[in-house]
Amino acid sequence: MTHLTVYPDTDPATVLLDTRDGAEIAASLSGIGVVFERWDAPHALGEDADQTAVLAAYEADVKRLMDEGGYKSVDVVRVKPDNPNRAEMRQKFLAEHTHDDDEVRFFVEGAGAFYLRKDGRVYRVVCERNDLISVPAGTTHWFDTGAAPHFCAIRIFTSPEGWVGHFTGDDIATRFPKFESEPQ
């Protein structure tokens, strides 16, 4: 279930907000310029569904998002627990970074956790199927796939280069709860 936990960025043991209420999540994230919406991801993906199949299944949604936001490129990231590169992928995304581009993600399968650092706080957003999140360019953040990742997200960009991260070198991600610690 979609879950927002807010911490002071200096104290991961102190919880300032903990909610699974979609409206409260959207309102809290809106306060830091992040768009969060619940959409419908009605298409079940086959085990072998590749980027082409995923984009074909969600073509109308992707086109609408790209037209509305002036986005130029799209791709799909799909990671399963048996992915041989899962550990290195996790480490790459766990490093705090920013982008020159908005980070727009529509989750169509599984779940993962965004950690957004803004105004002295860390916003941990566990996104799952049906969640759309748009993180503004320049927002300091990291993403945790979990130790046994299972998610598929459509990624939409204004830049034709796609995902380009600018790493901060800060080890803040090592101090906050990892995604696999998410209570069910």
Curated annotation (Swiss-Prot):
SUPFAM superfamilies: RmlC-like cupins. Ni(2+) binds at H97, H99, E103, H141. Disulfide bonds: none annotated. InterPro entries: ARD (IPR004313), ARD_bac (IPR023956), RmlC-like_jellyroll (IPR014710), RmlC_Cupin_sf (IPR011051). Keywords: Amino-acid biosynthesis, Dioxygenase, Iron, Metal-binding, Methionine biosynthesis, Nickel, Oxidoreductase. The record marks R105 as: Important to generate the dianion. One of its GO terms (biological process) is L-methionine salvage from methylthioadenosine. It catalyses: 1,2-dihydroxy-5-(methylsulfanyl)pent-1-en-3-one + O2 = 3-(methylsulfanyl)propanoate + CO + formate + 2 H(+); 1,2-dihydroxy-5-(methylsulfanyl)pent-1-en-3-one + O2 = 4-methylsulfanyl-2-oxobutanoate + formate + 2 H(+). Fe(2+) binds at H97, H99, E103, H141. Its cofactor is Fe(2+); Ni(2+). The record marks E96 as: May play a role in metal incorporation in vivo. Binds 1 Fe(2+) cation per monomer. Binds 1 nickel ion per monomer. The record marks D102 as: May play a role in transmitting local conformational changes. GO terms for molecular function: acireductone dioxygenase (Ni2+-requiring) activity; acireductone dioxygenase [iron(II)-requiring] activity; iron ion binding; nickel cation binding. It is an enzyme of class 1 (oxidoreductase). Pathway: Amino-acid biosynthesis; L-methionine biosynthesis via salvage pathway; L-methionine from S-methyl-5-thio-alpha-D-ribose 1-phosphate: step 5/6. Monomer. Belongs to the acireductone dioxygenase (ARD) family. Catalyzes 2 different reactions between oxygen and the acireductone 1,2-dihydroxy-3-keto-5-methylthiopentene (DHK-MTPene) depending upon the metal bound in the active site. Fe-containing acireductone dioxygenase (Fe-ARD) produces formate and 2-keto-4-methylthiobutyrate (KMTB), the alpha-ketoacid precursor of methionine in the methionine recycle pathway. Ni-containing acireductone dioxygenase (Ni-ARD) produces methylthiopropionate, carbon monoxide and formate, and does not lie on the methionine recycle pathway. This is Acireductone dioxygenase. The lineage of its organism: Bacteria, Pseudomonadati, Pseudomonadota, Alphaproteobacteria, Hyphomicrobiales.
